[in-house]
Amino acid sequence: MLYACYDAVANEGKNAYNQFAPIAERFNGIISDLGLTLSLDDEYEVIIDNFRKKAGKDYAASRGEYLNGIILANYLGYEFVDAAKVVFFRPDGKFDDTLTDTCLASVLHGLSHAVIPGFYGANPDGTVRTFSRGGSDVTGSIVAKAINAELYENWTDVNGFLIADPRIVDEPKVIESITVSYTHLRAHETREDL
């Protein structure tokens, strides 16, 4: 939706508010479903303005993660840290680990919890750039390194937990309810245990 909106506004000159309305409706629905009083209207205005200024497809692609990060931080009561302010790329487009580590360590120092959207950062000129692959998984490992975390766990995106391996059992059912500790235990079992 964000790519299509960006193209319609930046390249086809269509009405930005009309094009962005379904996106705002989707995010406002999430906010409502979570029972939050958060308003993203100012963020929507900035995004629409940047679409008009042709901020680029990387910027457009990153805005869903950005808005979801704000919502999640609000829901959890954590600080929101925009990845474009703490994750950096060099002029050649490669990840700048030195600058990123320094900035992340400084910004996160003293914070007990923070939400940092994944899969994007900023070029030296401040424009948003997305990682070529790996996305949020990469960002998580970058943050873990910068804060000298003892452990970084990356749980792959799935549509739920199944009662059996779908490679072995046809159409296994989804587990309706599961605890984090049980999930953790199962994730670390060896193949022989299964």
Where are these regions (language model features)?
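Nucleotide/pyrophosphate-binding catalytic subdomain
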Residues: 1-189
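N-terminal low-complexity segments that are often proline-rich with Ser/Thr-Pro
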Residues: 192-194
